């Protein structure tokens, strides 16, 4: 076989020409110490604040403290497999999670990984978790209602699409129940095809027991609400960094709907536990503690989260994200640090009281302390017309009831006020998982404020309401349809309603 020098030199020249000098450079560091969900890393000199890093066993972390000689990283997962000396890589990315309609009906963890055993998530894109809230110009004032299906809320503290309404109260006062009822009540609007009317639901569980989360998922499934809901769970047994991250993950999933001209409501249950998780992380990272040992930026923790709930203007798709954050108080102390912070950030609060709960007034809403800073602009015209007087009557009733305990000889007008107030209070009670449409609420509250209940004994008010609703549904469905379609209680509807109530009064005895 003949060897030609020219051919050999050509092969060598070709190889030299195609020789790549680019080496794969990735900046790495090594673990100095690890424990309690925090790792100290040596190296990674060019890492950026908030950047994701990856440990040698595949667990991800986020760089939060950039110090002169080391980097403080919070670990999104178990730290038991990580040991001193392990290699840590920069990823060059910021925490992102899957978003989109493919998440509806699913239960995911704080990083968006499915934990419900239903396989991988399809039809989803990825979006960054930490984004700036919309500015002032792209927003619009809140004007469409979120129908919670609870008379006490829809009549007295209405919530609008794009509002942030705090639900605050002690443990076991029914805070989560209010949120779950709101989800269940969206079944009717979500059954339609109009994306402008639908309201998708996101539930973020922070530091809850796993059994509690499983129970909530079961309740949503049994009531047919899971198909338009997403559950993000960072339970009590998960590391603090995941409990800190979960609300932002939920907000990112909600922003997908908001920015695409759709509507979503998100419940953070609860932000007290997120603040505790953040305090734990901050103290372990050796950040200086402030009041109640919370770090100085705990206000910013919640404000940047809740500012992402907004109503967008028509040029930006007219979508909305409504936030219902939950705060748990200790012995009714709303003047503690975290409750006052969140009250000042939100557009109103629904205040639930243990005393009312044990008296059997459920939902246990303290009507005097609960406010909505959006007010009647988030109500339908029909509800606005009937709910205006109920607020005043209940306020007068509370004032009088305090005095009436001392005096026995009350004049007729005071007695009438007390009788009416007792019946209205009874009327606002509602069992769990039985939300009402606004047209039914309108009729019931109209009956209460127009004196139809004055002759009914207090202990029969609930019975009166149930029978009235079945009477209206069976014999006056056209009236309910008229109120539902016009969203108003015009002269025609009012005349029909008065006639129906008069007819019902004769048969209810």
UniProtKB/Swiss-Prot annotation:
Reaction catalysed by this enzyme: ATP + H2O + 4 H(+)(in) = ADP + phosphate + 5 H(+)(out)
Topology of the protein relative to the lipid bilayer: Peripheral membrane protein
UniProt site positions, description: Required for activity: 370
Record-level Gene Ontology MF annotations: ADP binding; ATP binding; proton-transporting ATP synthase activity, rotational mechanism
Main localization, broad class: membrane
Xref: SUPFAM superfamilies: C-terminal domain of alpha and beta subunits of F1 ATP synthase, N-terminal domain of alpha and beta subunits of F1 ATP synthase, P-loop containing nucleoside triphosphate hydrolases
Compartmental location: Cell inner membrane
Domain of life according to the entry: Bacteria
InterPro entries referenced in this protein's UniProt entry, alphabetically: ATP_synth_asu-like_sf, ATP_synth_asu_C, ATP_synth_asu_C_sf, ATP_synth_F1_a_nt-bd_dom, ATP_synth_F1_asu, ATPase_a/bsu_AS, ATPase_F1/V1/A1_a/bsu_N, ATPase_F1/V1/A1_a/bsu_N_sf
Keywords, sorted A to Z: ATP synthesis, ATP-binding, Cell inner membrane, Cell membrane, CF(1), Hydrogen ion transport, Ion transport, Membrane, Nucleotide-binding, Translocase, Transport
HAMAP family: ATP_synth_alpha_bact
Job of this protein: Produces ATP from ADP in the presence of a proton gradient across the membrane. The alpha chain is a regulatory subunit.
Name the record gives this protein: ATP synthase subunit alpha
């Amino acid at each position: 076989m003949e060897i030609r020098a020219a051919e050999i030199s050509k092969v060598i020249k070709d190889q030299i020409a195609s020789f790549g000098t680019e080496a794969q450079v990735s900046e790495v560091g090594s673990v100095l110490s690890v424990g309690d969900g925090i790792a100290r890393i040596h190296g990674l000199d060019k890492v950026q604040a908030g950047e994701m890093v990856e440990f040698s066993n595949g667990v991800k972390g986020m760089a939060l403290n950039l110090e002169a000689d080391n980097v403080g990283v919070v670990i999104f997962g178990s730290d038991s497999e990580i040991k001193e000396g392990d290699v840590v890589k920069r990823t060059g990315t910021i925490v992102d999670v899957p978003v989109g309609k493919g998440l509806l009906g699913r239960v995911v963890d704080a990083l968006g990984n499915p934990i419900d055993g239903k396989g991988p998530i399809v039809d989803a894109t990825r979006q960054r978790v930490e984004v700036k809230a919309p500015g002032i110009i792209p927003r619009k004032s809140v004007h469409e209602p979120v129908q919670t299906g609870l008379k006490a809320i829809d009549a007295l503290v209405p919530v609008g699409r794009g509002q942030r309404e705090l639900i605050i109260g002690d443990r076991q006062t029914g805070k989560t129940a209010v949120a779950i009822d709101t989800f269940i009540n969206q079944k009717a609007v979500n059954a339609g095809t109009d994306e402008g009317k639908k309201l998708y639901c996101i539930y973020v569980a922070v530091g809850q027991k796993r059994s509690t989360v499983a129970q909530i998922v079961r309740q949503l499934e049994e009531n047919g609400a899971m198909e338009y809901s997403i559950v993000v769970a960072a339970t009590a047994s998960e590391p603090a960094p995941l409990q800190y991250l979960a609300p932002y993950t939920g907000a990112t999933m909600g922003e997908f709907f908001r920015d695409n001209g759709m509507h979503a409501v998100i419940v953070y249950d609860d932000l007290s536990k997120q603040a505790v998780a953040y305090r734990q992380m901050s103290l372990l990272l050796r950040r200086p503690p402030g009041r109640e040992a919370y770090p100085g930026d705990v206000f910013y923790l919640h404000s940047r989260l809740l500012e992402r709930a907004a109503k967008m203007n028509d040029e930006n798709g007219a979508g909305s994200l409504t936030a219902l954050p939950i705060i748990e108080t200790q012995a009714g102390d709303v003047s503690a640090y975290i409750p006052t912070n969140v009250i000042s950030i939100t557009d109103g609060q629904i205040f639930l009281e243990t005393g009312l709960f044990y008296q059997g007034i459920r939902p246990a809403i303290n009507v005097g302390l609960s406010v909505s800073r959006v007010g009647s602009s988030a109500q339908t015209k029909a509800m606005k017309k009937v709910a205006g007087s109920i607020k005043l009557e209940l306020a007068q009733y509370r004032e009088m009831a305090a005095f009436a305990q001392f005096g026995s000889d009350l004049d007729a007008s005071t007695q009438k006020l007390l009788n009416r107030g007792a019946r209205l209070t009874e009327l606002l009670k509602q069992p769990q998982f039985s939300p009402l449409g606004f047209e039914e609420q309108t009729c019931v509250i109209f009956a209460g404020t127009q004196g139809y209940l004055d002759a009914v004994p207090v202990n029969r008010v609930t019975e009166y309401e149930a029978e009235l609703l079945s009477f209206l549904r069976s014999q006056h469905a056209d009236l309910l349809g008229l109120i539902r379609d016009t969203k108003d209680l015009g002269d025609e509807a009012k005349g029909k309603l008065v006639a129906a109530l008069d007819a019902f009064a004769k048969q209810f005895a």
